Amino acid sequence: MKRLKTELNALVNRGVDRHLRLAVTGLSRSGKTAFITALVNQLLNIHTGARLPLLSAAREERLLGVKRVPQRDFGIPRFTYDEGLAQLYGQPPMWPTPTRGVSEIRLALRYRSNDSLLRHFKDTSTLYLEIVDYPGEWLLDLPMLAQDYLSWSRQMTGLLQGQRAEWSARWRQLCAGLDPLAPADEARLADIAAAWTDYLHACKREGLHFIQPGRFVLPGEMAGAPALQFFPWPDVDAVGEAKLAQADKHSNAGMLRERYKYYCERVVKGFYKEHFLRFDRQIVLVDCLQPLNSGPQAFNDMRLALTQLMQSFHYGQRTLFRRLFSPVIDKLLFAATKADHVTIDQHSNMVSLLQQLIQDAWQNAAFEGISMDCLGLASIQATQSGLIEVNGEKIPALRGNRLSDGQPLTIYPGEVPARLPGQAFWQQQGFQFENFRPQVMDVDRPLPHIRLDAALEFLIGDKLRRANR
């Protein structure tokens, strides 16, 4: 019997996938680094105070232990987990430094299966969870793969309304008089590209999300490369699409077109082929609160960014997503972050609003064969909720320390709209979202959270129920 058990264990190990790669993505300032830090912290503290009642393997005491193990890919930087914890437990506590490139951390989860057949032959199994972080700015380059240079130029210049028009004034000034068919002036093109980059930085600084090309604001090792020295043609119709499309590659317009092609083919497609093809599960983090606070332009910009992003995901079998990635990702979770920054009675509205934002992707998920869910969470809970009395009436409120100066606050931020806000919402805006510092926390206790265990159950719960199938 012992020999039979040993042979069956070997057979099970050979015939199953013991690895799961999780992609953590999100739009700018959505809390990606905090999410990974908190997720790892909860799992590592599974026997020392972690609160994970919604993770079935933890609730049923089948998750026996978790430890960090070396990465398989030595070329990817290590996720800065320890540095992030040091910031969170510091005096004063601070949020972890946001990610600026690809990073990874790998965990080994030892668990006992609840599979009634295999558990008689295999007492325990190990799941290797690889968590990959990369900037949301890079994710938003994906729609560029479905556009040529001129269609992209039309889209980018079409966005130059309102504040975007103000921030792009210098770029438009430098573009004036640029002859598309003249021999390429690399120095001038570099100056105009720098002005476009400054415009993108202004958009990011003011809380906008639809920023292309994403590498311009987070260039990494590509800083200064000619591949990052292009920009949209300022007025396609004034010159004529046919004339621009046929411009010699050594002309101003031709060089911009060729650099755009290179960026899409070598930078964007290369990045996704290298990393995205290998992902099994994905979580997309979305901060709906800051755009609500910033006004209709910021909110509509976030909506546009999500729409563009999700159009890249729910293409059919013969289209871009299938050709590039194949149906590898089988679970996709959308999470409305910072649930601790609104009162408990508004959590359901947060989720409803996010569902409205991604409804097209939701409708197509079943056809694509991708399991999707949507929830609200706080990776690291920064506030305490309770009731305060106002004019003899008790209302829900939050208590925390303001991020900017650390001053204690007790506030009711207001109501989160359950549906996409219309003009009436913006005219009578009563929503006042505050950014909070992390709470002062004991080093020997896991980080506090809201529904992080629900996210874990969706993303890895099924893998912890079976013996590495």
Label every model-predicted segment.
Residues 22-24:
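Hydrophobic anchor at the beta1->P-loop junction of P-loop NTPases
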Residues 30-32:
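Conserved glycine(s) of the Walker
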Residues 341-366:
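GTPase G-domain guanine-specificity segment
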Residues 39-45, 144-149, 299, 348-354, ...:
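Short secondary-structure boundary/capping segments
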Residues 35-36:
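Post-Walker A alpha-helix
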Residues 330, 335-342, 375-386:
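Short, conserved secondary-structure transition motifs
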